[in-house]
């Protein structure tokens, strides 16, 4: 099998670079074009601009329906909703550090940023986040389009990030297209203009992250998008549905075959058979009938059903339109239906957690400089919670049966409609206190 340049560019590993030259940056940008095209194609599928939209018909008189189906968006949104529909929470024995981390994350809209990262990774196979300090000296992080980033790792077993390149187009008021390039290293950030295949340095600034301020979030070991392996099946389904639509339109505009008589227009002129969709044969057998294509509807629908099932099966996303996926399933049955999604999401969680810990490490590095402290990023623990459909009645009955057997905190944590167990316990305690006060007041009045 031929090894494509794009496969290498999904994760670039080079020997340690003492000097990052302009020639190296330009070469990496040039070699990144195939990988950039792959990502942009996947993003077009997410927007339901599938390849079927590019199909042409040589005969303009034949129908050319171009029906695309949003499987790509469905697959990505299903996984992201299941994976991060409930925001990640954090816990730590170091409450002071946890408070600083939470404040930083709130300032950066971390919940929304995580969703963006998860969607980007689901589509492209990986996502990138850039860390920086804003004009108010606040620590910031933001997801970046993966097609605009080149991250270079060393070729050791640890695969550490050596440097990263972000390149993107900007447009001047004179409609002149200019490409800007930003280089991120362990010590500084360098800004360039990129024009006529040449880099011109504009400025550079130091940073205080003690590492390259870029975080990599992999979707899986192969850095594949969630629907990338089933693109050919999506294309086949689009083609089958489009061809079916064409066939029905052909049937609606079927040709009338007239035999045994020479047809003329009302003014005795030759009839325009093409415009009138008529075939005329001057043989001895007089008859008139429509010429239609014999469609094996049953076989065609079975074929499309198989494609639909295979798309769900090989992307591991649950088919919510399955008649067996009803609202009365038990918790065990729901988990069984979601087994495939859970396998994939388990990998997603492991990879995403690795990225989160690098983000936290970079945040803590800056906090330690600001506070002159030596806090450990490993004291922060991310907690993931699946956003799965539940049988609330079943869970409530189980929780009722555990009252008095396990702690109230454990019972409340089982209920999907209780978001903050600690706050709920405080409300319950306050209600009990008010009830007791009212009882005592009533007794005194008697």
Feature roles, as predicted:
Residues 266-268, 279, 306-446:
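C-terminal helix-loop subdomains that flank or include functional centers
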Residues 202-333:
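Extended, charged amphipathic alpha-helical segments
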Residues 119, 290-301, 342-349, 401:
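Short, charged/polar micro-motifs that form catalytic or ligand-binding hotspots
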Residues 1-141:
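Extended, helix-rich architectural segments
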Residues 1-6, 233-245, 249-252, 256, ...:
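Glycine- and charge-rich intrinsically disordered segments
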Residues 128-222:
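Extended, regular secondary-structure scaffolds
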């Amino acid at each position: 099998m031929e090894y494509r340049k794009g496969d290498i560019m999904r994760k670039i590993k080079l020997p340690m670079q003492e000097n990052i030259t302009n020639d190296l940056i330009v070469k990496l940008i040039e070699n990144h074009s195939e990988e950039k095209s792959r990502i942009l194609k996947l993003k077009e599928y997410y927007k339901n601009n599938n390849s079927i939209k590019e199909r042409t018909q040589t005969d303009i008189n034949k129908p050319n329906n171009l029906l695309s189906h949003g499987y790509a968006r469905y697959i990505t949104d299903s996984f992201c909703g299941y994976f991060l529909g409930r925001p990640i929470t954090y816990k730590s024995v170091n409450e002071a550090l946890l408070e600083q981390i939470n404040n930083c994350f709130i300032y950066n809209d971390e919940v929304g940023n995580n969703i963006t990262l998860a969607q980007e990774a689901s589509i492209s196979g990986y996502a990138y986040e850039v860390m920086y300090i804003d004009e108010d000296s606040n620590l910031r992080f933001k997801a970046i389009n993966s097609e605009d980033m080149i991250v270079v790792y060393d070729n050791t077993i640890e695969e550490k990030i050596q440097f990263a390149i972000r390149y993107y187009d900007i447009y001047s008021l004179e409609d002149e297209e200019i490409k800007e390039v930003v280089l991120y290293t362990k010590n500084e950030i360098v800004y360039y203009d990129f024009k006529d295949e040449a880099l011109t340095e504009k400025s550079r600034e130091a940073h205080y992250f003690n590492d390259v301020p870029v975080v990599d979030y992999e979707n899986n070991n192969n850095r594949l998008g969630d629907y990338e392996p089933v693109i050919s099946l999506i294309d086949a389904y689009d083609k089958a549905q489009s061809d079916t639509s064409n066939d029905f339109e052909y049937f609606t505009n079927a040709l009338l075959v007239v035999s045994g008589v020479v047809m003329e227009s009302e003014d005795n002129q030759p009839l325009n058979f093409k415009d009138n969709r008529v075939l005329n044969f001057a043989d001895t057998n007089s008859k008139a009938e429509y010429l239609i294509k014999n469609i094996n509807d049953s076989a065609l629908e079975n074929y499309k059903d198989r494609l639909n099932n295979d798309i769900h099966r090989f992307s591991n996303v649950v088919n919510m339109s399955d008649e067996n996926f009803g609202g009365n399933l038990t918790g065990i049955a729901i988990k069984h239906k979601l087994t495939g999604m859970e396998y994939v999401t388990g990998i997603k969680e492991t990879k995403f957690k690795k990225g989160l810990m690098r983000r936290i490490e970079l945040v803590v590095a800056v906090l330690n400089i600001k506070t002159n402290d030596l806090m450990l990023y490993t004291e922060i623990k991310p907690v993931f919670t699946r956003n799965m459909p539940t049988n609330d009645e079943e869970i409530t009955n189980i929780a009722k049966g555990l009252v008095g057997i396990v702690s109230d905190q454990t019972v409340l944590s089982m209920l999907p409609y209780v978001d903050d167990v600690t706050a709920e316990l405080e409300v319950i305690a306050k209600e009990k206190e008010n009830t007791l006060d009212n009882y005592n007041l009533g007794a005194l009045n008697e």
